[in-house]
Amino acid sequence: MAKIVNKYPVGIQTFEEIREKGYLYVDKTKYIVDFREKGMKYIFLSRPRRFGKSLFASTLQAYFEGRKELFEGLAIAEYEKEWVKHPVLHFDMSGAKHFDADGLNNYLNLQLLPYEKLYGKGEGEIYPNERLDGIVKRAYEQTGEKAVVIIDEYDAPLLDVVHEKENLQPLRRIMQNFYSPLKKLDPYLEFTFITGITKFSQLSIFSELNNLDNISLFDQYSAICGISKTELTTQMKPDIEAMGEALNMTYEECLNELTQFYDGYHFSENSEDIFNPFSLVKAMNAGKIAPYWFGSGTPSFLLKLLDKYHVNLSTLESQETVLSSFDQSTEEMTEALPLLYQSGYLTIKKYEPMFQEYTLGIPNKEVRDGLLNLLIPHYVNPRRSDNNAFLLGFCKAVYRNDIEAALEHMRTYMATIPYDLENHSEKHYQTIFYLMFSFLNIYIRTEVKSAIGRADAVMHMPDTIYVFELKVDKSADEALAQIDEKGYMLPYHAEGKRLIKIGISFDSTQRTISDWKIKEE
């Protein structure tokens, strides 16, 4: 059996350790060359959690510290000749979660202390902003070189309270105060790099640093974090072959499975395909494809967000929108879309330049399945002992194309859903319908546009396409008639598959399916 060739840095985010201990490093140093050649001085990068931001920040630290030996054989080794050693202040804010104001001030104190030991502390420097200001100036005076400031996960202290106004305000004031010296420190700074998940416009980073380059949506930086398809198939090809052999798959089958699970991220209009690096590295190291990123902990703010905005998973599969709707500051959010995109639960699927229209969607199977598991308890009883029995019977019926039996299973099951989980709206029934089919990894879409309307749901099977119309307290015949009247079947006539239309009637009193009609085109 083939062995894994590379040594994978599971849980390691320090560039120095990766290079010194011989772990696989996917070279991203060409982006540092790009920054330096363009004279870029203040940079902000937004990427989802566990997506390689901290490793890139660590790489920048090693570069500006002049650690030439760590970069041997990498792209930047051909560019850099001088390797000037700058004083580097690297603040990791990822540990500042779930703090109140006192806890956050204590955390900032611990972040500043090591640099005050190095460069001293001035009299009268009490508050974090005063201390940061003094450290940068003394570092410059003592070394003769301008300082570099790296702030990793700058928004971590605020994300968990983003929708709790009374808790957010004091924490935001503390962070605003801490970041406030950066603008006036310009003469003492060589470079500033800030990472995060989202944008808090009222922090001084964005309101005062008017020369800040936000590279998060630029094509040329789409692969700055994460692993591109090219990087995967060149640097990890032997290991994909070894994994495939262990899983009784060909190389192509294994690559396709990795792609389905972890690929699909796009961070700009013309972005490369980007794989989730956390999951990919874990999978390659373990030799097993599993939901590592989603399973590593769903942030509490996401659960609050889904609840606050009553997020319907079926609408997330394809969201047509404009840039300002998802690339906006957290304080200005009136819907879940921006934070779902910035957190990695949605990504750019398509861009239409004529209308400057973006289509956002769920990036891959790992995220899709994770969201399904997260949302299903909102619509069904999570403690039902017969959930698995229902899903098994439902699954078998669907895969043998016995829609009659599948709907009978669904009718029986839905009648037992607790009353307090029901709201009787057509959207609610549509969501339950969608979730049950999606849980089986069947390709189903809701609200699918045709020339003069939207089909409630379209399900694609290997040899058959099903078009569904759902009605509440109306007849199945009415639902079937609407499919014909609105031309919902027309887009699929050229696909060469069986076309079946299904009208379904839900009874809000009985809280389940009351009738259905099935007709083949």
Language-model segments: what does each one mean?
Residues 1-425, 440:
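Phosphate-binding site recognition
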Residues 148, 464-466, 500:
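Structural motif
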Residues 169-173, 472-489:
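Mg2+/Mn2+-dependent nuclease catalytic core
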Residues 433, 455-472, 486:
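Conserved catalytic cores of phosphodiester-cleaving nucleases, focusing on short active-site segments
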Residues 436-450:
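A short acidic/basic microdomain associated with nuclease active sites
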Residues 451-455, 497:
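Short beta-strand or tight-loop elements
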Residues 491, 495-521:
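Domain-level recognition of nuclease-like catalytic cores that cleave nucleotide substrates
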